[in-house]
């Protein structure tokens, strides 16, 4: 892979001051600088957010919407960035079921070793079983010498004559009988004697590299044929293999990888169901035996009253046949036990609500038992008590020894050890063990190499002491981050930008060098690594240093240096460089007198501690250090801290003693971060805000105006800005950066509060101050000053006092927490325990921390720190070191002395500490080595066997344009989408927590492939089927609507939909101004109405607690604590009763703000002679006082209830019945006949009254225009047929009679925008969203160039970028409000293309489905250029190419074949296929024919009906007065560029004219067939037999068989779609999706019906040895031969055979077919079953999805239709199909407004005479066959 520059400019995130950075891909970039300088803002808030959001936006909506919570970074331009992954501390906090072994794939590698070489054993006797897995058999055969001839044999299970005939029909030619090979035909008449030992020869081949795929296919066929048995003959040596063994009625099969996963269904422990934990009930009262499950008899079980648990429990009750309402004591012990502890392989079908689908969906849940579910949570948590009720206890499962594995897996061994024993070994011991393992097998060596590599990563990262079964949730933050790094290294993803957050945290200095090596490996895999680091040693790791500073917060945010590390050390003058050069150092304090008081801790044995006793000095700074895993946390956090807590509770722990001293208080400052929200600020955290608010409330003006302390809190409604609720910012949508509130300009408060000053500053000014400024400002207020000084003492002086805690870095949060504790220091001698307090701190900040910690010891307190940072260790008064290693080798006390004494010892810390004390610390050595190139830049696919693929291996070069060619159904789609796309999605999704990745994996089943390596994140661009077409507009599909809605929400000005006047804003201040103007000196009562539907008693109780005391109703006031009358009218909470006067304006403002905080509407009562009520709502109003809501993003979106049009529900279109438009269709009916057609049982009198009796009985065509309109539209006595039919449609939406009369028409209310009136009247520069949606992209670009503010710059920039890509794919002409489902195939595909490429990322693997098919030749260069640009931008493009048109432009081509279906799926040599070499810029293609056979076209006889034509004069959309005619009984082709109007001509022109002629009966054709381009819509249930209506005849035949009659089986019982016939467990699907929570879905054949879909009883009926389920698996060609006597099915079967689909099973699911196969099916259905009556076929781009082989015979077939008396008009872009027509119509010359004109009409051979034609240069000039 080549290294490319990455540019990021104009970064304004948080404190970054419009900075720009650059670096190269595949570099290690180290971001450094003082804490709070802006490093995390660049790394995480800019680079990570941008890379992640851009890639996620291309994923399916259900996944993308789950994880787009990151705000868009404020940045001007990003170029060259690849998809990003952030690895932070606590990286796996959401991975509830993960262990070290499962996450790093150690267990999956070990399971594979057990599968291939493990010894299966009998669980009872432990005796070895002689079994082979498929992989083991293959591995054994692969060890044979190259070039040896081998025969693969399978035992012959049946030897009778009928069986021999059947084998011969299947293509087998030889058998091996008693050691000798014989031709199979020699036994056709006699059969084979029973006493002969016979094998059938599956295949004979030479073992070579070229034959591996064939070898795999033949071997697996042999095992399937021999039901688990086969043999291999080579050089007269016979090797026999068996995959089954039966002992005591138990059949044992070979070991599989799934057996060694506690999450797999069959392999889990039968007692704990895979959790490894046994939960015992110690208190029997936890279960109330008198209650039922429905009544929640088990207090620890999920609540049955919830929908989720009730559904699951009901499914359990149905499966076990018991009632949920039965008391527990009356349930059988077996059911009780299953409820509590589950049952093996118990899978429940449940219908749960699926949020991604928006409906209930059938899924299958494994029932493990409620106790085992609890055990599962306990197994993976650090706080088991959270899940254990009192009276319950958790123990390791006695049956599986805590592994969760079943007994068969538990006793299996490999290299003398069980899987359980491996799980309990440390990673160091694993490494020692596996380094000794030798294997002659190449495949085993490869697995061992991968496993050893992962172990090396983990050990190099200092994690060797961990055991692989350690739950990730129990690891420290640093351990989790380093485990994540190892996981990513093992995953071998390419092209990722990894962003690491201080990976050296928690790492001892001796392990840092190993960490450096591991991170370099991550880079050398082809990734970019961004490090946020402070560790000096990490400087030697970086390829580039970016130093941010110079200070922190507002004093930072600038790029001080960007370049090579050596230049940084030599030339930079920043604090970081000075500390590295030791120009600045942290001094070691002078030695103190010997301590006089000590703390003694004895008998420390928890975890790996070796019975330690320690002695710690009091009133000193003590450092506890040691290598990772040595026992520091166990000693301090798990032993010392609990002992101190017990001592302070006066429980006198035996292991704690004091010598001449004591501890009176414990402060344990952990690394757990405090709650962070936008409403928490530093002032609130250190408790200084209360004092400041009291100070402002005590000012004279505050006292005069009645402003209290609450008014100065932005979290209280009294003073907070009503618009932003006190936040100071407004968020347009979740993924946008907040913008300053337009009402308070970011000040958080309303104006009256801001008028209160103290020393010239208001409360907002105080919040804007830094701690440095505030410390000086409040110098005269000791209480406030002391608290702010605590921040400054910890170098947080730069921090704005009002900055939300949610925006602080990790280092800032740690110091803020410490400042909080320092403020509340006690006179009691306190022990402060800190766990790595230097986390996130720069060396400069560490110095301040040390000063604070030492000051505490000078006050007599004791400070104990767990620390690896040598700057801290060197200044400690006393040091404890644990070691010497981690895990079992740790837990010893190596040193207990002063730092100076420590460096005299030979310990790991002593070696690291010595240079710091002696002042001999060297500047890190910088090795300017270029990154080593990855070993392989290829995407490697091994053993791909999805669908038709024949276990192929291949390598695809990265950063190339790759074409995958081959016939239809040869495996192209399976390879590109089912394997590459699925593998890439799963690999990328697995880098996220399970709660996120679960959504994507739901839609991504595990691919059938051995291994895929070298993938980058993938993006697919597929053809959309009709069922997947969106009703959204172009603007919505491309993300333009979202940006425009945000833009109008910020800049839009509302106008009245009624008067079009500009609206004025209603705010609390405008309400007060109105009151002062109209009711000055009157008294008012300000109230908040009680919400309708509220429980009045409960509501009032809550309000009483909040301090409200009065209720208002009908002019009366009531105390809330008194008895209230019933049936109160308009009750409202009283906020305030006051006089309207300027003096009271602030109290009025406060009261109104409080009222609005309680409800969206407030009522103000004016106390006059006649009391008057005023109602107000915030928002906008017109001059007459009509109220309108606030302008929000939701209000401007048709996807939200607030914004959508009520008439059309936001769709922009309505269904309409207008009989006036269909008069010709219904002209022959009388009014009474037409009425009774829809309402046969209704009363006819209204129709007769409406029309004269004689007219009601006449045909509609004889009515006058007025009478016909009355009949359609109605009168006062009769609503009209239009209205009646619309009412009928509401109750019978699928009525076949009404559907032809329906038409979609633009909604008159919203004019097609989908927005309500108000939203359509929000304008910018007098332009509304409706105006924009009615224009094209060019108009929008011009509009955007006229507007813009600082707040909207990023939105406008994003919109302009999207418009650029719309232009690139040639769609600028399309109206933005046009619906997506109205686009042509080519337009729709380019729409998806524009969306996917607009992310502008690098290192993506783009997967395209036929990018050049269905395009006009003129558009081909545009798309090819786009694909090449993607490659030039360092991406990989892989595209299927059935037409071979991309191959000439590809860098690499793969050919699959040689045939379709079972005959395809092999990897072919490139020289076996001849493909066209197309010059996209030449007049004539260089090679015209692919495949080789030339098209043979016989011209139709034009004399018959040659004078009959179909004429149209069309005006619609951009087409005006287009006059064109098409001859009938001829092949008529329509060509033209996309968007020129071809489909409009076909459907709005020729189709409607044909319907009119048919209605009049004045045409030579009597039927009309319209065929669109969409592949046939498919569901999980539809198959070929149902689509062609073959299944009913076959079902009827089976039902007529004697056996069916004897069993009383009707034809419906052979249907997979009826309850009587379908298998009840899989609902007739033949398979089950096993929901494995956050693992990819597993598809398994249904065990009940064995995948045959029909119920077992129906499988008893056989015909020629096959039941109906087996018949559905039979190829079409075989069905045609077997059932020639069923006449009804011969026509569809012949059509399928003629088009070349005979290889497909008759019951093949339509959803499983390739696009080419689906199109071929549709073609066969409509065109190969010739209708009996003369028919006009209108075909809209159907043929573009056919492969060349099927397309070769298409002109001949179309010609046969013409010769049979039919007419064909088709749209296509294929030049060969266009020139094969009798008559060609070309529309153009451009798209949209530039199209719609007739360029040519006539014979294709005359096109060269045309001056206007664009097609003529593509059509061959040779003479067409006559």
From Swiss-Prot:
SUPFAM superfamilies in the record: P-loop containing nucleoside triphosphate hydrolases
CDD domains in alphabetical order: ABC_UvrA, ABC_UvrA_II
Keywords, comma-separated and alphabetical: ATP-binding, Cytoplasm, DNA damage, DNA excision, DNA repair, DNA-binding, Excision nuclease, Metal-binding, Nucleotide-binding, Repeat, SOS response, Zinc, Zinc-finger
Pfam families according to UniProt: UvrA_DNA-bind, UvrA_inter
Matches recorded under Gene3D superfamilies: 3.30.190.20, ABC transporter ATPase domain-like, ABC transporter ATPase like domain, ATP-grasp fold, A domain, P-loop containing nucleotide triphosphate hydrolases
Compartments it resides in: Cytoplasm
Function field: The UvrABC repair system catalyzes the recognition and processing of DNA lesions. UvrA is an ATPase and a DNA-binding protein. A damage recognition complex composed of 2 UvrA and 2 UvrB subunits scans DNA for abnormalities. When the presence of a lesion has been verified by UvrB, the UvrA molecules dissociate.
Family: Belongs to the ABC transporter superfamily. UvrA family.
GO biological process: nucleotide-excision repair; SOS response
Superkingdom assignment: Bacteria
Protein name (database record): UvrABC system protein A
Binding of ATP 3, residues: 966-973
Zinc finger (C4-type): 721-744, 1623-1649
Residues at which ATP 4 binds: 1536-1543
Binding positions for ATP 2 per the UniProt entry: 626-633
UniProt-recorded Gene Ontology molecular function terms: ATP binding; ATP hydrolysis activity; DNA binding; nuclease activity; zinc ion binding
Residues bound to ATP 1: 33-40
Chief location: cytoplasm
Cellular component per GO, a single term: cytoplasm
PANTHER family membership: UVRABC SYSTEM PROTEIN A
Top-level taxonomy: Bacteria, Pseudomonadati, Chlamydiota, Chlamydiia, Chlamydiales
Quaternary context: Forms a heterotetramer with UvrB during the search for lesions.
Domain ABC transporter: 1-581, 594-909, 1503-1814
InterPro entries on file: ABC_transporter-like_ATP-bd (IPR003439), ATP_grasp_subdomain_1 (IPR013815), P-loop_NTPase (IPR027417), UvrA (IPR004602), UvrA_DNA-bd (IPR041552), UvrA_inter (IPR041102)
């Amino acid at each position: 892979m080549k290294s490319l520059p990455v540019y990021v400019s104009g970064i304004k995130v948080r404190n970054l001051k419009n900075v720009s950075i650059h670096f190269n891909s595949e570099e290690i970039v180290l971001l450094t600088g003082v804490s709070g300088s802006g490093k995390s803002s660049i790394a995480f808030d800019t680079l990570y957010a941008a890379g992640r959001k851009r890639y996620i936006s291309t994923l399916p909506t259900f996944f993308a919407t789950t994880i787009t919570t990151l705000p868009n970074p404020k940045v001007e331009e990003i170029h060259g960035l690849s998809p990003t992954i952030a690895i932070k501390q606590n990286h796996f906090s959401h991975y509830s079921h993960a262990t070290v072994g499962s996450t790093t794939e150690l267990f999956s590698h070990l399971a594979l070793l057990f599968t291939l070489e493990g010894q299966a054993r009998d669980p009872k006797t432990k005796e070895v079983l002689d079994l082979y897995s498929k992989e083991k058999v293959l591995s054994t055969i692969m060890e044979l010498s190259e070039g040896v001839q081998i025969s693969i044999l399978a035992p012959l299970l049946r030897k009778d004559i009928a069986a021999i005939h059947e084998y011969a029909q299947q293509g087998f030619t030889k058998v091996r009988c008693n050691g000798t090979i014989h031709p199979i035909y020699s036994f056709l008449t006699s059969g084979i004697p029973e006493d002969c030992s016979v094998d059938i020869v599956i295949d004979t081949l030479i073992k070579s590299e070229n034959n591996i795929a064939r070898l795999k296919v033949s071997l697996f066929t042999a095992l399937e044929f021999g039901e688990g048995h086969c043999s291999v003959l080579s050089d007269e040596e016979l090797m026999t293999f068996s995959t089954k063994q039966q002992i005591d009625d138990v059949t044992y099969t070979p070991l599989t990888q799934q057996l060694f996963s506690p999450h797999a269904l069959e392999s889990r422990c039968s007692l704990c169901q895979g959790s490894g934990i046994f939960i015992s009930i110690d208190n029997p009262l936890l279960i109330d035996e008198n209650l039922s499950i429905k009544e929640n008899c088990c207090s620890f079980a999920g609540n049955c009253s919830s929908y989720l648990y009730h559904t699951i429990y009901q499914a359990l009750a149905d499966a076990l046949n018991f009632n949920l309402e039965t008391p527990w004591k009356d349930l059988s012990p077996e059911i009780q036990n299953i409820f509590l502890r589950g049952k093996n392989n118990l899978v429940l079908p449940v219908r749960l609500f699926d949020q991604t689908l928006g409906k209930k969906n059938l899924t299958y849940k494994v029932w493990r038992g409620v106790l085992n579910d609890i055990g599962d949570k306990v197994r993976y948590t650090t706080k088991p008590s959270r899940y254990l009720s009192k009276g319950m206890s958790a123990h390791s499962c006695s049956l599986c020894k805590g592994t969760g594995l079943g007994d068969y897996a538990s006793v299996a061994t490999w290299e003398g050890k069980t899987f359980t024993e491996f799980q309990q070994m440390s990673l160091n011991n694993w490494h020692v063990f596996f380094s000794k393992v030798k294997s002659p097998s190449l495949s085993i060596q490869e697995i061992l190499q991968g496993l050893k590599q992962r172990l090396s990563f983990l050990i190099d990262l200092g994690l060797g002491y961990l055991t692989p079964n350690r739950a990730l949730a129990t690891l420290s933050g640093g351990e989790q981050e380093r485990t994540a790094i190892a996981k990513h290294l093992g995953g071998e993803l390419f092209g990722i930008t990894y962003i690491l957050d201080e990976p050296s945290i928690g790492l001892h200095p001796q392990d840092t060098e190993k960490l450096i090596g591991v991170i370099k490996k991550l880079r050398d895999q082809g990734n970019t690594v961004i490090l946020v680091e402070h560790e000096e040693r990490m400087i030697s790791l970086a390829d580039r240093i970016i130093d941010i500073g110079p200070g922190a917060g507002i004093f930072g945010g600038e790029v001080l240096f960007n370049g090579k590390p050596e230049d940084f050390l030599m030339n930079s003058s920043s604090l970081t460089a000075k500390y590295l050069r030791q120009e600045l150092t942290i001094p070691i304090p002078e030695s103190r007198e010997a301590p006089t008081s000590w703390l003694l801790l004895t008998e420390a044995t928890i975890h790996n501690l070796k019975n330690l006793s320690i002695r710690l000095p009091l009133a000193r700074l003590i450092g506890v250090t040691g290598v990772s895993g040595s026992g520091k946390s166990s000693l301090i956090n798990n032993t010392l801290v609990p002992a101190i807590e017990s001592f302070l509770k006066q429980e006198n722990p035996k292991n704690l003693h004091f010598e001449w001293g004591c501890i009176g208080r414990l402060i344990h400052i952990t690394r757990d971060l405090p709650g962070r929200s936008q409403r928490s600020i530093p002032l609130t955290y250190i408790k200084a805000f209360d004092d400041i608010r009291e100070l402002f409330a005590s000012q004279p003006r505050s006292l005069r105006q009645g402003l209290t302390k609450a008014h100065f809190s932005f979290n209280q409604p009294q003073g907070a800005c009503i618009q932003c609720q006190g936040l100071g910012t407004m968020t347009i949508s979740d993924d946008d950066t907040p913008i300053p509130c337009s009402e308070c300009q970011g000040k958080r408060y309303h104006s009256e509060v801001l008028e209160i000053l103290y020393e010239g500053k208001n409360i907002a000014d105080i919040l804007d101050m830094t701690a440095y400024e505030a410390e000086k400002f409040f110098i005269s207020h000791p209480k406030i000053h002391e608290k702010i000084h605590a921040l400054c003492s910890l170098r947080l002086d730069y921090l704005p006092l009002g900055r939300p805690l949610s925006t602080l870095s990790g280092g800032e949060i740690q110091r803020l927490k410490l400042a909080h504790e320092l403020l509340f220091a006690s006179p009691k001698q306190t022990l402060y325990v800190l766990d790595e307090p230097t986390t996130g701190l720069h060396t400069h900040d560490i110095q301040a921390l040390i000063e604070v910690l030492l000051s505490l010891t000078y006050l007599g307190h004791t400070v104990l720190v767990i620390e690896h940072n040598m700057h801290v260790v060197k200044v400690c008064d006393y040091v404890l070191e644990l070691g010497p290693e981690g895990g079992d080798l740790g837990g010893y006390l190596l040193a207990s002395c002063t730092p100076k004494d420590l460096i005299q010892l030979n310990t790991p810390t002593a070696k690291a500490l010595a240079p710091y004390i002696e002042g001999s610390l060297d500047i890190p050595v910088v090795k300017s080595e270029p990154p080593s190139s990855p070993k392989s830049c290829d995407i490697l696919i091994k053993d791909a066997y999805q669908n038709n693929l024949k276990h192929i291996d291949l390598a695809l070069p990265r950063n190339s344009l790759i074409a995958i060619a081959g016939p239809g159904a040869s495996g192209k789609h399976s390879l590109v989408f089912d394997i590459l796309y699925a593998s890439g999605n799963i690999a990328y999704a697995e880098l996220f927590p399970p709660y996120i990745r679960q959504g994507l994996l739901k839609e991504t089943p595990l691919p059938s492939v051995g291994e895929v390596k070298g993938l980058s994140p993938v993006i697919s661009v597929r053809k959309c089927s009709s069922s997947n077409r969106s009703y959204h507009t172009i603007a919505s599909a491309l993300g333009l609507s979202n940006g425009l809605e945000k833009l109008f929400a910020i800049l839009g000005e509302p106008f009245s939909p009624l008067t079009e006047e500009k609206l004025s804003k209603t705010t609390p201040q405008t309400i007060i101004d109105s009151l002062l103007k109209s009711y000055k000196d009157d008294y008012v009562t300000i109230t908040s109405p009680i919400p309708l539907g509220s429980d009045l008693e409960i509501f009032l109780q809550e309000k009483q607690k909040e301090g409200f005391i009065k209720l208002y109703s009908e002019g009366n006031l009531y105390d809330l604590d008194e008895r209230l009358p019933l049936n109160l009218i308009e009750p409202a909470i009283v906020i305030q009763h006051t006089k309207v006067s300027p003096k009271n304006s602030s109290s009025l403002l406060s009261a109104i703000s409080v009222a609005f905080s309680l409800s969206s509407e407030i009522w103000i009562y004016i106390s006059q002679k006649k009391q008057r009520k005023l109602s107000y709502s915030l928002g906008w109003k017109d001059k007459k006082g009509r109220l309108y809501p606030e302008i929000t993003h939701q209000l401007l979106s048709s996807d939200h209830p607030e914004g959508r049009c009520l008439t059309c529900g936001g769709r922009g279109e309505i269904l309409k019945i207008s009989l006036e438009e269909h008069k010709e269709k219904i002209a022959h009916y009388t009014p009474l006949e037409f009425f009774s057609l829809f309402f046969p049982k209704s009363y006819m009198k209204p129709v007769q009254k409406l029309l004269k009796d004689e007219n009601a009985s006449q045909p509609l065509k004889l009515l006058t225009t007025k009478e016909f309109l009355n009949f359609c539209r109605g009168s006062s006595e009769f609503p009209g047929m239009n209205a009646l039919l619309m009412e009928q449609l509401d109750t019978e939406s699928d009525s076949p009679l009404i559907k032809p009369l329906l038409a979609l028409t633009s909604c008159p209310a919203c004019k097609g925008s989908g927005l309500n009136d108000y939203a359509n009247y929000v304008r910018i520069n007098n332009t509304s969203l409706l105006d924009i949606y009615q224009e094209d992209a060019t108009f929008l670009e011009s509009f955007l160039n006229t507007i813009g503010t600082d707040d909207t710059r990023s939105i406008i920039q994003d919109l302009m970028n999207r418009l650029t890509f719309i232009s690139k794919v040639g769609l600028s002409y399309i109206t933005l409000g046009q619906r997506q489902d109205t686009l042509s195939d080519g337009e729709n595909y380019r729409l998806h293309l524009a969306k996917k490429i607009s992310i502008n990322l690098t290192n993506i693997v783009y997967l395209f489905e036929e990018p050049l098919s269905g395009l006009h030749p003129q558009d081909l260069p545009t798309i090819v250029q786009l694909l090449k640009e993607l490659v030039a931008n360092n991406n990989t493009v892989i595209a299927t190419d059935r037409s071979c048109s991309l191959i000439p432009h590809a860098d690499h081509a793969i050919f699959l074949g040689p045939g379709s279906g079972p005959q395809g799926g092999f990897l072919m040599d490139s020289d076996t296929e001849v493909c066209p070499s197309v010059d996209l810029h030449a007049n004539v293609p260089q090679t015209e024919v692919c495949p080789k056979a030339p098209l043979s076209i016989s011209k139709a006889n034009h004399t018959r009906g040659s004078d009959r034509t179909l004429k149209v004069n069309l005006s619609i959309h951009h087409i005006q007065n287009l006059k064109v005619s098409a001859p009938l009984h001829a092949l008529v082709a329509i060509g033209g560029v996309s968007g020129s109007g071809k489909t409009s001509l076909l459907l709005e022109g020729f189709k409607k004219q044909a319907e009119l002629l048919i209605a009049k009966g004045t045409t030579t054709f009597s039927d009309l067939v319209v065929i669109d381009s969409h592949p046939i819509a498919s569901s999980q249930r539809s198959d070929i037999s149902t689509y062609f209506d073959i299944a009913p005849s076959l079902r009827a035949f089976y039902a007529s068989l004697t056996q069916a009659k004897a069993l009383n089986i009707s034809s419906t019982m052979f249907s997979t779609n009826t309850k009587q016939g379908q298998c009840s467990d899989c609902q007739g699907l033949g398979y089950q999706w096993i929901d494995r929570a956050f693992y990819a879905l597993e598809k398994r054949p249904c065990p009940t019906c064995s995948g045959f879909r029909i119920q077992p009883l129906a499988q008893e009926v056989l015909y020629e040895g096959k039941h109906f389920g087996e018949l559905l698996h039979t190829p079409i060609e075989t069905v045609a031969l077997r059932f020639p006597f069923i006449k009804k099915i011969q026509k569809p079967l012949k059509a399928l055979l003629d088009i070349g689909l005979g290889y497909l099973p008759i019951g093949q699911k339509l959803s499983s077919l390739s696009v080419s196969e689906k199109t071929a099916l549709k073609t066969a259905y409509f065109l190969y079953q010739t209708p009996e009556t003369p028919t006009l076929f209108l075909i809209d781009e159907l043929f573009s999805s056919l492969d060349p082989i099927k397309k070769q015979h298409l002109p001949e077939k179309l010609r046969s239709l013409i010769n049979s008396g039919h007419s064909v008009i088709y749209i296509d872009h294929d030049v060969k199909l266009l020139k094969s027509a009798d008559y060609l119509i070309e529309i153009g010359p451009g798209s949209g407004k530039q199209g719609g004109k007739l360029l040519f009409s006539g014979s294709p051979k005359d096109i060269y005479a045309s001056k206007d034609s664009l097609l003529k240069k593509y059509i061959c000039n040779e003479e067409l066959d006559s």
